[in-house]
Amino acid sequence: MLSKNLLEALNDQMNHEYFAAHAYMAMAAYCDKESYEGFANFFIQQAKEERFHGQKIYNYINDRGAHAEFRAVSAPKIDFSSILETFKDSLSQEQEVTRRFYNLSEIARQDKDYATISFLNWFLDEQVEEEAMFETHINYLTRIGDDSNALYLYEKELGTRTFDEE
């Protein structure tokens, strides 16, 4: 059985994952508005991944005999000055998610809830990948700078991204 404190934190994180999906869709909308369909696709796929994470937490809460609670999702940032800004904001968002999963893991450890610790390890591994991915994209975009040909090619590459739940 999940402790009240752990259940509250899991519900908070589940809702935060759905907020992250909204934030990535807002970034996709910005990219579409600026005619960057490849970058828009990248963020749409990222939003799908965040919804998958939310669903994974939802399933876990219910599998543990508790109740997943959905809350209002606040409006995400919608104005960006550049593609680079969307990726920098994404990295900040992922760093916040990592911090939140560390906090969840600490609560589970204090509760000696080893099943939840095991469950959360998947997310911690995922966060290492997410942060590294966004750091790489930021490095590439910074290196590209104002080179429109390089940006075009990079956008086309990211436009091929898909999300597979496997």
UniProtKB/Swiss-Prot annotation:
It comes from the Bacteria. Iron-storage protein. It comes from Staphylococcus aureus (strain MRSA252). Belongs to the ferritin family. Prokaryotic subfamily. GO terms for biological process: intracellular iron ion homeostasis; iron ion transport. Keywords: Cytoplasm, Iron, Iron storage, Metal-binding, Oxidoreductase. Its EC number is 1.16.3.2. It catalyses: 4 Fe(2+) + O2 + 6 H2O = 4 iron(III) oxide-hydroxide + 12 H(+). Residues 2-145 form the Ferritin-like diiron domain. The gene is ftnA. Gene3D superfamilies: 1.20.1260.10. One of its GO terms (cellular component) is cytosol. InterPro entries: Ferritin (IPR001519), Ferritin-like (IPR012347), Ferritin-like_diiron (IPR009040), Ferritin-like_SF (IPR009078), Ferritin_DPS_dom (IPR008331), Ferritin_prok (IPR041719). It is found in: Cytoplasm. This is Bacterial non-heme ferritin.
